Amino acid sequence: MSADLALLGRQVRHELIALRRTPLTMILSIVFPLLFFVLLAAVVGNETVDSRQGVRLAQFLAPSMASFGVVMATFSFLAAGFAEARSTGALKRQGCTPLPRWALLGGRIGAALLLGLIATLLVIGTGAALYGVQVYARTLPAVLVALVLASVSFSAMGLAIALLLPTPQATIAVTNGIVVPIAFVSDTFTVNGTLPSWMSTLGWLFPLKHLVNLLGEAFNPYLTGNGFQLDHLAAIAAWGVAGALVAAWALRREQDRTSERRHPARSARASDARPRRTTSPSLVALLAGQVLHSVRLLSRNASSVFFAIAFPILLVALIPTVNGGGDQLMADGRTLGAFFAATMAGYGAAVTAYVNLPTGLAEARDDGVLQRIRGTPLPAWTLLTGRVVGAQVVALLTLAGIGVVGGLMYGTPMPAAWPAVLLTLLLATACFAVVGIAVMTVVRSASSMVGVTLGTLLPLCFISDVFVVGVSYPPVLQGLSWFFPLRHATRALTTAAGATGIDGGFSWVHLGVLAAWTLAGTAVVAVRFSSVRLEPKRHRAS
């Protein structure tokens, strides 16, 4: 028994070291729940709700953010890591070693469990130290049991998803596509509001809401008892058992398929040896080819399609709904649905141009693709311009999808000043793309690139009127938000979407700021991209 525990401990340590070397996993599973807690506390205000007992609003916010950290660490990113190991062959190679399969899976689940506990400790510890969150000794055993049970159950479900889906990109898209809507219907992001009855009922079908309520009741100062809620624990355990059964079945199916796989040899055609073109292509043809290539790169990556297109559309459907409905009128006469349609269009453009585009270039650099392209007649400006225009095409597709959803759900009409909306979106996308490429020339690896771009974009979204509106932030945050281009893009888009005439809606000051950032980013790219180290990552000196 002691030898088995030692083996499991070493495997957990191995998985934690691997996670530490993946900045994106660490940021999204540990840092983001804490960041969301801090930002939401600033948004809703940490007011004292009971001066006699010293209860503040953060007392009811911290448990939901801790639950969100657990599900992100144990469901989303355990599934993504397992799918990546399977696709690269690491899982197959580990299966050929004397390492027992239970230790292999147990190491991943144990690492995810510890990651979820760390995320919970950070949120609760920060809440207790800075926001007056009270921790009760009488409910700590119930909290620990709930966290362990939920972590194991979410891990089993994550493994099942990873084994059922064919690629890591599809796994990332599906897991996040599951977590985000369920988080909204599970009261994770709801503090002062009330969900529609159908959404509240739907939330009870999934285990996350049971965990949110378990932790919420354990930290509720007005309840007595030890915090053990057997009905919630049973619901979480039932989902875990179902996930484990599906994972076991999928694992056996995977082993059978691996043993049966054969790749038949293919013969080359004689026509492949003949050149398809006898003249040099025009610059227009080169640029069109790069634009088409950029769009194809996105369409072949399920996770990029989800975060750049599907996720903004999903938020347009969810955020207004949980805030009273998209037909609710704001102070300036605009509907909530129309406002968030404009902000989500800007968010989708930022994800496409500032996160996905430069990350793709960084991956191409690490794989040696950019180095090989440099040895061809393709001009560098054509490559980069094609990527920027491709990002603009994707941003327009996202805008079209948002318009369809807004029209169907809230009756949002097409903006009267649609030329201003299109011009603003195109300029904002170009600005985000150029700034992202400039950042790529400074950051050394693709994995770090994701952490830098996503780690700066999401906090700015909270203080730039993207996810929330009408919140008064401290002067420092206000000034910071107006310094970067995201808030100018958001304000220009919402102004254009709310204009009443076809010839209006142009926010020249905000457009000027976007143009200035674009020019500054272009200057950095012009200086840095030609001298950036393009050799494959494995050939660089450490």
Q: Model regions: which residues?
A:
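Short, membrane-interfacial amphipathic segments enriched in basic
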Residues: M1-V12, W198-L208, R269-V291, V476-L486
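Transmembrane helix-boundary elements of multi-pass transport/secretion proteins
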Residues: D4-L7, E15-T88, T120, Y136-T139, ...
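Transmembrane helix segments
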Residues: V31, V38-E47, L165-L205, K209, ...
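Membrane-interfacial helix-loop-helix junctions in multi-pass membrane proteins
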Residues: S51-R52, D187-A242, D465-G521
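Helix-loop-helix units of permease transmembrane domains in multi-pass membrane transporters
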Residues: G81-L113, G360-Q392
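Alpha-helical transmembrane segments and their short interhelical loops
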Residues: R101, G106-T175, G225-A234, A380, ...
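Short, highly charged, low-complexity non-transmembrane loops/tails of multi-pass membrane proteins
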Residues: T258-P275, P536-S542
